Amino acid sequence: MFAILKKYRYPLFLVLIGLLWLEVLNLLLQLDQQTLIYPDSSNYLESAQKMYLKFTGHYYRPMVMAFITGLPYLFGSSDAGIFQWSLIVNVFCWLGTSLLLFQMTKEFLSEKIAFIFAMLPFFTIGSTVLNYHLLTENIFTFFIFLSFYCLFRYYKTNNFWFLSFSLSLLLSSMLIKPGVKFFALLMLLLFLKTVLKNYKTKSMILIYGSVLMILIQIVGMKVQYGDFTISYIDGVTYHNYLFSKADCFKNGKEYHQINNPRAEYLFSLSFSDQKRVATEDAIHQMKTNFPNVVWAYGHNLLENTKTGNACVIDVVNKKNTGYFEFCKAVAYDSSKWQNRLFTLLGFLVSLYYIRQLFTRKSGEALMAMFVLYTIMLSGISSGQGDRFHLVTFPFAIFLLAKWLSETERFKRFSVPLQK
């Protein structure tokens, strides 16, 4: 027993530290006492209800998130039970991401140094607070990080099972967050030659299964709502945020996310018409209002980089403790500066590693591509605080650790012990 504890002491310490920190933040901000349910959370609850109780699909939220969220319905759970389950799943994925980060960094760092890097995601306020909300960020981050873990294992072992699992996770992730679909398809394209060489092997079942789920989602949306699409959320997002803001800039008006006439009009339409109107408006503005579209995009990108966690702003002092407002202010300011720091670090270190794509498909270069893709994609939306960028923080930490390990000064203290 002692030998097992000694062998796995670092992962066990990681889990313990993560849970302790989660409880500390919970006590300071009264996270388990909050009753606010965000519109996105209501959407995810509704998608689970549609899948498990009505056997239909959701217009905005694809099937994988609905499947994960709604599992307790199989056991007669109430809606309140879904939120309790969400906390368990979020914490599992939140801890799992740091455990994977530790496993990956100890390949080129000593275990002690890898342990320090693996702890860093715990102390990003945004991801910790989001554990208490029915949202996708921590689940999505875990899926993508596990995908890259498998990709690095494939590079090390040349075992196609790892590549198959990696690509299947990426493809499945577009049924959690549809915005990742272009990155997932690009990754599949980059490894298409290898995939085609192995198309008859048993390990391809993972990729085939993911593709089948995507086809079911697309065909189901056509049958139920009228279009071959994964989700209608993309059109709503760029119409109501990016192009509505560009239209406001054009007409000299101040943009408001709430009470947005363009958004109200769009939501009055059928889902198929929402997609059509959003697409037509995007094309029209790109032709006639391009400078303001670029300005709106840059404005969104800057806002998503410099703002803190919106969920922290909304916490309420339910227990009337005297220290609450101070802790709330510190937590928000911390999340704001963490967003700025990790976004900037992630962007810079990703630029450093993405150069390798011109010579070889290294795991670091592909991870850097994901970080840059996510940051740049965030420009189509706004008003969500650090939610867009915090999914990149663990990847930025890994790339930073990798870069530091390659410097002579840091290498002396971090090279793993020879076995």
PLM segments and residue spans:
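Transmembrane-helix signature of polytopic, membrane-embedded enzymes
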Residues: 98-123, 141-142, 361-366
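Short acidic/glycine- and proline-prone juxtamembrane loop motifs at membrane-interface regions
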Residues: 129-140
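Extracytoplasmic catalytic/substrate-binding loops of multi-pass membrane glycan-assembly enzymes
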Residues: 29-46, 56-72, 79-84, 228-231, ...
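Short helix- or helix-capping micro-motifs
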Residues: 18-20, 114-125, 149, 170, ...
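Transmembrane-helix motifs of polytopic, lipid-linked glycan transferases
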Residues: 88-108, 142, 146, 348-352
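Membrane-proximal stem/loop segments at transmembrane-domain junctions that anchor or position
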Residues: 225-318
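Loop-to-helix entry region of an early transmembrane alpha helix in multi-pass inner-membrane enzymes
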Residues: 59, 63, 67, 75-99, ...
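Membrane-interface anchor segments at the N-terminal boundary of transmembrane helices
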Residues: 81-85, 293-375
